[in-house]
């Protein structure tokens, strides 16, 4: 039987979504991010800070399950959360599974009700790439700031303390370090 695969972040949503949409739909979860920037080596500083994402080890089994479900489906709809992280997760799903960012439907809903889900399925959009780029920029900055400044804190400030210090893009200005 062919079906449309709806990919969400949380498996808790799947039962209700499948119930609302009926037998022509199957819902699966990514369980959040499936790729990451694990260290500074994943950022090409000489090439406009181009990131190279890696599969998250703990998600390899889920990636395999999603790959099979995508292959068995006749259509895929991305239904990750309506925020920067959700948009980035949807983009990673497209990248990992070779789905078109321009033609894979992106559905957005803010409540798990039949009306909201059906409305989202009937009015799909596409990935919001400016939001994806904003999330990637934040992630890259977090890595650069954290990896470059935290060791300085360890060396110069926390050497007499048993507590480790760290620096981040948001926490450093917020705490006036």
Regions found by a protein language model. Give the residues of each.
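Prokaryote-biased recognition of long, low-complexity C-terminal linker/tail segments
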Residues: 142-177
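Intrinsically disordered, low-complexity regulatory segments
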Residues: 1-145, 173-176
